[in-house]
């Protein structure tokens, strides 16, 4: 997808060239497992931007965040209160945080493993804090992660000679109940979670902490106080990206709903909501598989983008009109994108076209992707967004760096149903 910044485009091309052949190999293997090779069936894959695409159009550069993107779609479409939502997806090794305020929030340049990727992705922030994050006491400080106990050997409670982890702290504090877990732990995978083992390991660490505290003339702590201390450190680590996607972008966090999912999300959601001042928490009934559920709800989408390098508004021009050449180019991109979706089986009558301009002030390097506003005044929408995120405006020309079109073929709407009372 051509955009300004050649080096980032080169990195993106490299990622696509490296990953796409592996994806093609997987697709061939997957299809070969069916008697007809899925020739009579439609096969779609989730992309990092939150939309589906036909298998033959799936590219490596659009696959990096496809799993977490499914989770964003899942909570966004099932948490319908007319209020903005913070998504909190806590798993075993990491936590993914995002925000949904009625429109998908995308980023168009990111870095993964030191490689810049210039492709539309849902704005998902990841931190190394999860149920398997290890607990350390170093130089008088409680530390959580970034090292993970993993699935094997896992936390101490897995009975595989593992490491103290967040899961052990939750178990000791009674936030996890062994009776509600299957007996799949231990070397023969036939034993329950080991509460005694977790408490013994945490007691050993508590003794070390109290020994250092006594040397410094500080009071001792109980096992429960130490466990809670580690959880507070983990919670603060996870709160940081939540503030990044909300407060640091000019949004009032207290006006949001917290939607938690993932295998460990429910253990920490209330504590995070309390610290953030959020009064309503959603825990989906499919919390452990919400990313997969969201993929089933996602729309079929495609995008087109190209550089522009045009002036949109002069200094002091509050209501500039979109130059006719840019409007024509946007229409051409929309036609190309619509044709691709129709080739994938979408009906032309259902397609929704979304237009965007990638704008910045003259002399700056801070771009904002602005969706076409109802009144068509891109410049004013850009100024308002810039003011909300950065707290000031500039008396400078507004430049168009890129044109972007997103065409969507909506999936069937969710059918609401009542659950029987417990």
Residue ranges and their predicted role:
Residues 1, 47, 61-69, 89, ...:
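Active-site nucleophile and cofactor-binding loops and adjacent substrate-binding regions
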Residues 86-87, 94-144, 153-155, 283-294:
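Glycine/threonine-rich beta-strand-loop-alpha-helix active-site module
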Residues 84, 92, 145, 149-152, ...:
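C-terminal, non-catalytic interaction/recognition modules in large multi-subunit enzymes and RNPs
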């Amino acid at each position: 997808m051509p955009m300004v910044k050649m080096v980032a485009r080169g990195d993106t091309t490299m990622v696509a060239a490296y990953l796409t052949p592996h994806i093609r190999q997987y697709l061939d293997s997957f299809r070969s497992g069916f008697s007809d090779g899925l020739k009579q069936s439609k096969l779609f894959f989730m992309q990092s931007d939150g939309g589906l695409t036909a298998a033959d159009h799936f590219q490596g550069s659009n696959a990096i965040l496809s799993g977490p993107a499914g989770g964003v779609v899942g909570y966004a479409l099932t948490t319908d209160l007319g209020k903005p939502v913070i998504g909190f997806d806590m798993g075993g090794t990491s936590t993914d945080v995002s925000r949904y305020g009625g429109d998908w929030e995308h980023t168009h340049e990111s870095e993964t493993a030191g490689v810049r990727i210039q492709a539309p992705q849902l704005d998902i922030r990841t931190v190394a804090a999860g149920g398997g994050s290890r607990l350390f006491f170093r130089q008088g400080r409680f530390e959580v992660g970034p090292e993970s106990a993993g699935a094997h050997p896992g936390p101490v409670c897995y009975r595989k000679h593992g490491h103290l982890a967040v899961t052990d702290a939750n178990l000791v504090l009674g936030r996890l109940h062994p009776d509600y877990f299957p007996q799949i732990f231990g070397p023969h995978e036939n034993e329950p979670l080991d509460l005694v083992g977790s408490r013994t390991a945490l007691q050993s660490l508590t003794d070390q902490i109290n020994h250092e505290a006594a040397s410094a003339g500080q009071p001792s702590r109980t096992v429960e106080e130490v466990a809670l201390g580690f959880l507070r450190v983990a919670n603060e680590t996870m709160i940081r990206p939540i503030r990044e996607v909300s407060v640091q972008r000019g949004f009032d966090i207290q006006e949001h709903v917290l939607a938690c999912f993932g295998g460990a999300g429910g253990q920490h959601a209330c504590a995070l909501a309390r610290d953030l001042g959020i009064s309503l928490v959603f825990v989906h009934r499919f919390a452990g598989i919400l990313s997969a559920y969201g993929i089933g709800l996602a729309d079929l989408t495609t995008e087109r983008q190209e550089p522009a390098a045009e002036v949109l508004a002069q200094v002091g021009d509050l209501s500039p009109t979109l130059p006719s050449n840019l409007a024509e180019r946007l229409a051409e991109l929309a036609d190309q994108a619509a044709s691709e979706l129709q080739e994938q089986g979408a009906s032309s009558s259902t397609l929704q076209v979304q237009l965007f301009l990638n704008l910045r002030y003259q002399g700056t390097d801070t771009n904002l992707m602005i969706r076409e506003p109802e009144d068509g005044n891109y410049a004013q929408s850009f100024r308002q967004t810039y003011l909300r995120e950065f707290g000031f405006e500039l008396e400078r020309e507004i430049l168009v760096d890129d044109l972007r079109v997103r065409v969507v073929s909506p999936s069937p709407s969710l059918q609401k149903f009542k659950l029987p009372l417990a």
